[in-house]
Amino acid sequence: MNVLFISPHFPSHFYHFCAELKALGANVLGVGDAPYESIGENCRTALTEYYKVGSLEDYDAVHRAAAFFIHKYGRIDFVESQNEYWLATEAKLREDFNVKTGFRPANLEAVKYKSRMKAGYERAGVKTARYLVVEGLGAASGAALRRFARECGYPLIAKPDNGVGAANTYKIDSSAALKDFIASKPESVPYIIE
């Protein structure tokens, strides 16, 4: 089994994923933009091989790394990372190299957008918090948000609908905090409010 692991060293304490794959007999093929020497020893010893690219943002370079590994080790069975940021890169690699496991670009939105995840949970019968997606914060969106706050009460949690981790997450616990959020939220970033 060949596992292409993007940025295998990040976060540093997640090397266990690579180590356990290796223990199961997998070739763990790392692609990253960090110098090999800077990767923790636990991660380095878990990798079969590491291919350094100038930047993981350079899809062509990552694609060439995957092609190199395929030429050397055979078909890639899994493309993984431990960083939500690389979901689109993983999906494109799966599509380009016909990897049968994992999300492809066409179905990536179901796991990338919090509002779409909630729709999936609801279809599966999993209860979720009531929510509102706010695309921009013009007068109509501000009014809808204030109405949502009146109906649901405080506190509300606001976070980017498409975002990594808890970055730019707000706890709104009063009408004054809601007013501040409306005034400061970037117009171009869709937010999900729960």
Identify the residue ranges that each predicted region occupies.
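CheY-like receiver
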Residues: 65-69, 147-148, 181-184
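Short amphipathic alpha-helical segments and helix-helix/interface helices
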Residues: 15-22, 118, 145-146, 179-182
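ATP-binding N-terminal substructure of ATP-dependent carboxylate-amine bond-forming enzymes
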Residues: 1-106, 138-139
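Short acidic active-site motifs
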Residues: 61, 141-144, 177
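Conserved ATP-binding module of the ATP-grasp superfamily
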Residues: 127-129, 155-158, 167-194
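A general structural motif
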Residues: 25, 76, 151-155, 188
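A conserved helix-loop-beta module that forms one wall/lid of the active-site cleft
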Residues: 95-169
